[in-house]
C-alpha cells in the first residue's frame, strides 16, 4: 500500500529505485565486520534508515529523525531477489515462523509502536476504525495488551467477519450504522478508552474523535491522502472531553530498531499474532506488477 501511495504518488520516490519495504529472507552473505548475523539465518529487517546526527536522533527519538529514509524510497528496496541491509536493521526470526509471516513483521511493528505510545492498559476498551492489514493487526495487538473489549469498524462485511475471527468482540458496519451511536450502544453508553484510526481516509479520520470516552485517547496510524474536514461536534470532543490525541509514525524506537520488533517476533512465534489469515495471494516476483 504505502509503496505505491506514499512513495510513488505523494512521496519522494526516485525513479529507478526498487520498491518494497516489508520482507523476509535468508542471509546469503555478510560483511567482514558483521558479528551478530550469520549466513543461513532466517530474518526480516527494519526498513527505516535514521541519520544519527539530528536533534531527534541524539535524543534517541529515531521515528522523528529529520532525515529519515526508508528502503524503496531513496534506497533500493525489497521487491528483488537480493537486498543489502545494515546489520543493526536485521532482525532474526525463529525457525517456527514462516517466511510469509516474517514479511508481515514490519506492519505489525507499526501497530505496536502506536500502542506503546498511548500506554494501552489491561482492561481498556478499544475501537479500531478500518479493518485492513493494520486494523486487523491492531485488533490482535489490543487483545495482547489485555483490552477487555475490542470494537471493529469497517464498511466491508467480509473484513468485519475476519476481524471477529481475529479477536474483535463487536463489529460495526459504518456504511449502515452511525459509529458514534453504535459504539456507545455496545459499550454501555460510553465511548472507548482508546480509539484507533487505521483506515487512513478523511472521513474516518474525522469520525474517530467522536468514539473516545471522556479523558480517552485517540491514536492515528492511518494517513489520509486528502484534507480532513472535522465536524464541530467531533472537534469539540477533543476539548470538552479532554482527549489525548496521538500521531504514530513508523515503527522504531531505542535501542534501535526497538521493542516493537522483538515483541512482534515473539508474539508471532507463540501464535498470539496470526498472520496467515491476512494473506490472500502468493505470487512470484515475476508477477510483481500484477500484484
Which residues does each predicted region cover?
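Mid-domain Rossmann-like dinucleotide-binding core that forms the NAD(H)/NADP(H) cofactor-binding site
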Residues: 97-177, 181
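Hydrophobic beta-strand signal
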Residues: 44-45, 127, 219
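Glycine-rich cofactor phosphate-binding loops and adjacent beta1-alpha1 units
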Residues: 118-120, 161, 165-244
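Rossmann-fold dehydrogenase core element
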Residues: 217, 232-277
Amino acid at each position: 500500500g504505502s509503496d505505491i501511495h506514499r512513495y510513488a504518488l505523494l512521496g519522494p520516490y526516485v525513479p529507478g529505485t526498487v520498491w518494497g519495504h516489508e520482507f523476509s529472507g535468508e542471509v546469503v552473505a555478510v560483511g567482514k565486520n558483521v558479528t551478530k548475523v550469520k549466513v543461513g539465518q532466517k530474518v526480516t529487517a527494519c526498513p527505516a534508515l535514521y541519520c544519527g546526527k539530528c536533534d531527534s536522533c541524539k535524543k534517541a527519538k529515531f521515528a522523528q529523525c529529520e532525515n529519515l529514509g526508508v528502503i524503496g524510497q531513496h534506497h533500493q528496496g525489497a521487491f528483488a531477489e537480493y537486498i543489502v541491509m545494515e546489520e543493526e536493521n536485521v532482525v532474526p526470526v525463529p525457525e517456527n515462523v514462516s517466511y510469509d509471516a516474517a514479511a508481515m513483521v514490519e506492519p505489525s511493528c507499526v501497530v505496536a509502536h502506536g500502542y506503546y505510545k498511548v500506554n494501552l492498559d489491561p482492561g481498556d476498551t478499544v475501537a479500531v476504525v478500518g479493518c485492513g492489514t493494520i486494523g486487523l493487526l491492531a485488533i490482535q495487538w489490543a487483545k495482547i495488551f489485555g483490552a477487555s473489549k475490542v470494537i471493529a469498524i469497517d464498511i466491508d462485511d467480509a473484513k468485519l467477519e475476519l476481524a471477529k475471527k481475529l479477536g474483535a468482540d463487536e463489529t460495526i458496519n459504518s456504511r449502515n450504522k452511525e459509529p458514534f451511536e453504535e459504539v456507545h450502544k455496545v459499550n454501555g453508553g460510553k465511548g472507548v478508552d482508546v480509539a484507533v484510526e487505521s483506515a487512513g481516509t478523511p472521513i474516518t479520520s474525522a469520525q474517530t474523535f467522536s468514539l473516545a470516552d471522556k479523558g480517552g485517547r485517540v491514536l492515528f496510524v492511518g494517513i489520509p491522502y486528502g484534507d480532513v474536514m472535522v465536524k464541530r461536534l467531533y472537534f469539540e470532543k477533543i476539548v470538552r472531553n479532554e482527549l489525548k490525541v496521538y500521531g504514530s509514525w513508523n515503527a522504531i524506537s531505542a535501542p534501535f530498531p526497538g521493542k516493537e520488533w522483538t515483541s512482534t517476533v515473539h508474539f508471532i512465534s507463540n501464535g498470539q499474532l496470526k498472520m496467515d489469515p491476512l494473506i490472500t495471494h502468493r505470487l512470484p516476483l515475476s508477477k510483481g506488477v500484477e500484484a
